[in-house]
Amino acid sequence: MEAQIHILEQEAYSAVLRAFQAQADEFSWDKATVMTNLRKELRISDDENRQLLNNVHNDDLIKRIRDSRPRGGNQVVRHQSLDVHPSPTFSASRKKQKTFQSYPSIGSTRSKSFNNRVVSANEPAEALIGRKVWTKWPEDNSFYEAVVTQYNANEGRHALVYDINTVNETWEWVDLNEIPTKDIRWDGEEDGVTLNVGHGGGTTRGNRRTLSHGGRGRGPRTQPRREHLATENGGGRKFFGEIELFNTDSLVKEVERVFDSNLPDPHELDKAKKLLKEHEQALIAAIARLTDASDYESDGEEPYSHELPMLLG
């Protein structure tokens, strides 16, 4: 039963990925957050995530939708106030061959445009989860975008995930108080705002990279046991209503029919997009119900979890 549920979870995750990819070439921040939450709820491992992303990128239907999309439309604006330069290739000492989206050293942010949401001096460490941040790596003097996904209170460290929801996703555990204020920028931070997340101390960055195996952003995932939901009315199994979804094969054929034509009818294009959107919403609703059902069916087994481990160097 558990294996069958996980197959459904993979199919659901892949379907949402495809729908998002069909809507736009790049994920908005809201969609990236949705996918991160889905990975947790659907127990999608790192390897599974990479494989599913590759499958979506190589999907013929998605390619046709991309090719038919007007260039410059529906694109996500990525902080145009920061001059993005080509990402450097890191040395072998980092034990990985990849690049991050990077930003030149921004020094003073007086001329930069951030939104008005700032980091409060008394803000608890957990409140930073979900925030977007740029940290500077001394090796190339460039800033790299990440999102804070977790906080370990015992160690006083936050998990920073780079290239989130992509095949290049990597992460590290960081004591944010070890990073000099000039080397960190928050989405929503104005010039002169200092960071104080209420834990630890120190002003040096020497112990920042604590991953002793596999370089920055690599390490095994933990699989803690999940607690079961309490049964209602003193016992018995909770029965869930039927889940109704579009027939995926029929939906794909309908969308392919629209995009296979040389001059797609705008009305038909809108209809296809609406179908994809409705399918996406139905899948998200079904996923929530499947997650509840999985809790009752797991019966003490340890499902996947995607919390990042603390690697002690």
Swiss-Prot record:
Signal peptide: none annotated. The gene is EML2. The modification Phosphoserine is found at S294. Probably involved in the regulation of chromatin states. Contributes to RPP7-mediated and basal immunity, especially against Hyaloperonospora arabidopsidis isolate Hiks1. Regulates negatively EDM2-dependent floral transition. Residues 1-88 form the ENT domain. The keyword Phosphoprotein applies. Disruption phenotype: Reduced resistance to Hyaloperonospora arabidopsidis isolate Hiks1. Slight early flowering phenotype. Residues 35-58, 267-293 form a coiled coil. GO terms for biological process: defense response to fungus; response to heat; vegetative to reproductive phase transition of meristem. CDD domains: Tudor_Agenet_AtEML-like (cd20404). Gene3D superfamilies: 2.30.30.140, ENT domain (1.10.1240.40). This is Protein EMSY-LIKE 2. Interacts with EDM2 in nucleus. GO terms for cellular component: nucleus. It is found in: Nucleus. Keywords: Coiled coil, Nucleus, Phosphoprotein, Plant defense. PANTHER family: PROTEIN EMSY-LIKE 2, PROTEIN EMSY-LIKE 4. Residues 206-219 have a biased composition (Basic residues). Induction: Slightly induced by heat stress. Residues 84-106, 195-229, 294-313 are annotated as: Disordered. The keyword NAD does not apply.
